[in-house]
């Protein structure tokens, strides 16, 4: 990401994504966001003060630096002595466009500043010396006083972060991941997380601080609101962190309790409404789209690419000459799911598109197969030619098997709902049915993860593959976001500063192999959706090819893969072209780039030793 202002072309996020899969089955944004029926409304924290253990309220100010001779403390405005080449102080003279103490390579060059950038910077390119096209801009090493305890969970040399992980024996998570034979354990995840932190702290400027990480194992399953709320209370009362990463992804209770206690988090629950985030500024950030944003993209795709035309990609030949009749299958995860479905149908109506049959289901292993039979029968009776699916990555297996059993062969329209658009899960669906699947994806076209990915960078840096070999693609985005923003916050680390740095950054560049992210007010979405607390803004067009063989996202070899149209070309809201989809056209389509596209090539470097 690049900051707005004089340095608007300077700052880039680091390698956030090899595979963007929001957060472990983050699930089922299925989930489409919103409150749990039994969740209490959290108390909105209006004050910027911080509660400390003794109950005394303290202002979130920069701590005064104690004087070395034991006398009066020095003012925070007094910068420590430095030598040339200049180590960063907080005062750079002219307006830099950055927060105090922050400087990036291109802006320093514009100002004529001489800075020893160190080995972590490729000074020929002005980017970090890591083998990735998405390497972030070099941040100047900081040599000044960082303010010490600038906010809750922050000291002169540490930032307390709690990372929530599910239990190894969580039956809901086991059900979700068993289909793709994911055998990573919580211990594997923790080892990989700590390895990623070493990597980021070696290359990113942290202003004298390191993350003091606590791994917290959930006390219940990812669907249990009572356990989730208890976990949030424990986070507050026992760990008192600056921020939390992760959370039980099928309930909002964890996030709501954290926010009521003034603790921000990244990917700590299902997506919420824009109103929720506006009422709790700086408290929550997600990496994927919001449910309402995704609805807008899907409606535009259907309205521009599919509506009014014959269902030429249906498996039933008799449907191919008929004008498309749309049905929708969606996951009922909370009361907000109902609102989201209604919003989607209203958006489609703006394109004069009607959903002739809309059916919801509940993700329950005991009832899913029975529900699938009933729902498919309804679709067939309504003469639906094109089924719009918005749900979890397990259910399409049951729906497609049931459709085959009932000799019903429609088009399947995928909508970017989490993990449905991964090859790993799509191989578990009825392949003849799924050979008629196409639509949009939030994911980007993949590059062979042996040559360009979070997996590749981990092995490059550590000299060995990550223990969480399956999960690293969904672990890495959160610390990637955290450290990229941390560089822009500067030495005076506060929750408000974190939000300011993130919101002042320009969108990340779009590429064939990475989505574009933005936060704040960037005019990428209607006013009702901004400020934007979600990350990914664009989509790609995809279709399922049951014939091609290759590796899935977790290196399982097999048959059947998603094809990305035009090499993975991406579109923002309003940019989706009119006209028939390019589904099932081999020309220009790609399953996996065996090497980065020529436009995304990068130099090779030797890794630095861990800091």
What kind of region is each of these model predictions?
Residues 84-148, 152, 507-611:
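Solvent-exposed, acidic/polar segments of extracytosolic/periplasmic ligand-binding ectodomains
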Residues 91, 112, 116, 122-124, ...:
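Extracytoplasmic ligand/sensor domains, especially the bilobed periplasmic-binding protein
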Residues 81-231:
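N-terminal extracellular/periplasmic Venus flytrap/periplasmic-binding protein-like
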Residues 147, 188-194, 202-280, 361-369, ...:
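Beta-alpha junction/loop-to-helix N-cap segments that form part of ligand/metal-binding clefts
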Residues 25-47:
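C-terminal region of N-terminal signal peptides and the immediate post-cleavage residues
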Residues 2-21:
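N-terminal export and membrane-targeting signals
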Residues 392-398, 443-508:
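Extracellular/periplasmic ligand-binding modules, especially the Venus flytrap/periplasmic-binding
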Residues 42-85:
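Extracellular mucin-like PTS domains
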């Amino acid at each position: 990401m690049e900051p707005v202002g004089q340095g608007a072309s300077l700052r880039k996020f680091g390698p956030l994504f090899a595979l963007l899969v929001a957060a472990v089955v983050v699930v089922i944004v299925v989930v489409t966001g919103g409150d749990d029926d039994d969740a209490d409304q959290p108390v909105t924290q209006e004050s910027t003060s911080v509660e400390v253990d003794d109950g005394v309220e303290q202002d979130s100010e920069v701590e005064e630096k104690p004087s070395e001779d034991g006398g009066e403390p020095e003012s925070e405005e007094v910068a420590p002595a430095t030598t040339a080449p200049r180590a960063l102080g907080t005062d750079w003279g002219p307006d830099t466009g950055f927060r105090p103490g922050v400087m990036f390579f291109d802006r320093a060059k514009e100002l004529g500043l001489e800075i020893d950038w160190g080995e972590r910077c490729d000074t020929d390119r002005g980017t970090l010396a890591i083998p990735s096209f998405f390497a972030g801009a070099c941040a100047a090493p900081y040599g000044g006083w960082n303010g010490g305890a600038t906010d809750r969970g922050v000291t002169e040399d540490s930032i307390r972060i709690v990372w929530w992980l599910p239990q190894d024996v969580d039956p809901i998570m086991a059900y979700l991941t068993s289909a793709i034979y994911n055998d990573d354990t919580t211990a594997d995840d923790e080892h990989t997380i700590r390895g990623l932190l070493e990597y980021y702290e070696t290359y990113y400027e942290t202003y004298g601080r390191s993350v003091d990480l606590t791994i917290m194992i959930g006390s219940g399953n990812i669907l249990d609101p009572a356990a989730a709320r208890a976990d949030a209370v424990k986070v507050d009362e026992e760990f008192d962190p600056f921020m939390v990463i992760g959370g039980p992804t099928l309930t909002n209770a964890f996030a709501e309790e954290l926010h009521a206690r003034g603790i921000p988090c990244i990917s700590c629950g299902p997506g919420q409404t824009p109103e929720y985030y506006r009422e709790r500024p700086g408290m929550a950030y997600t990496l994927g789209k919001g449910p309402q944003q995704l609805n807008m993209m899907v409606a535009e795709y259907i309205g521009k690419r599919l509506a009014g035309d014959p269902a030429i990609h249906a498996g039933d030949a008799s449907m191919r000459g008929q004008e498309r009749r749309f049905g929708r299958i969606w996951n009922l995860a909370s009361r907000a799911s109902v609102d989201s479905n209604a919003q989607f149908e209203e958006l489609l109506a703006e394109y004069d598109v009607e959903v002739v049959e809309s059916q919801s289901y509940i993700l329950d292993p005991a009832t899913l197969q029975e529900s699938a039979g009933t729902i498919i029968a309804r679709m067939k009776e309504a003469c639906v030619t094109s089924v719009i699916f918005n749900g979890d990555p397990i259910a399409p297996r049951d729906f497609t098997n049931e459709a085959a059993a009932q000799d019903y062969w429609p088009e399947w329209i995928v909508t970017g709902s989490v993990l449905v658009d991964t090859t790993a899960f799509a191989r578990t669906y009825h392949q003849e049915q799924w050979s008629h699947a196409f639509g949009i994806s939030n994911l980007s076209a993949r590059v062979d993860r042996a040559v360009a990915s979070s997996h590749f960078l981990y092995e490059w840096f550590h000299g060995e593959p990550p223990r969480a070999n399956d999960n690293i693609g969904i672990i890495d985005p959160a610390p990637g976001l955290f450290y990229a923003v941390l560089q822009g916050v500067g030495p005076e680390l506060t929750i408000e500063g974190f939000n300011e740095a993130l919101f002042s950054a320009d969108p990340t560049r779009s590429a064939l192999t990475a989505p574009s992210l933005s936060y704040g007010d960037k005019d990428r979405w209607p006013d009702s959706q901004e400020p934007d607390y979600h990350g990914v803004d664009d989509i790609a067009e995809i279709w399922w090819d049951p014939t091609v063989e290759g590796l899935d996202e977790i290196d399982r070899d097999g048959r059947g893969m998603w094809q990305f149209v035009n090499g993975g070309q991406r579109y923002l809201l309003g940019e989706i072209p009119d006209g028939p989809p390019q589904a099932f056209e081999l020309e220009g389509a790609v399953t996996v780039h065996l090497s980065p596209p020529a436009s995304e090539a990068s130099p090779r470097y030797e890794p630095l030793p861990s800091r």
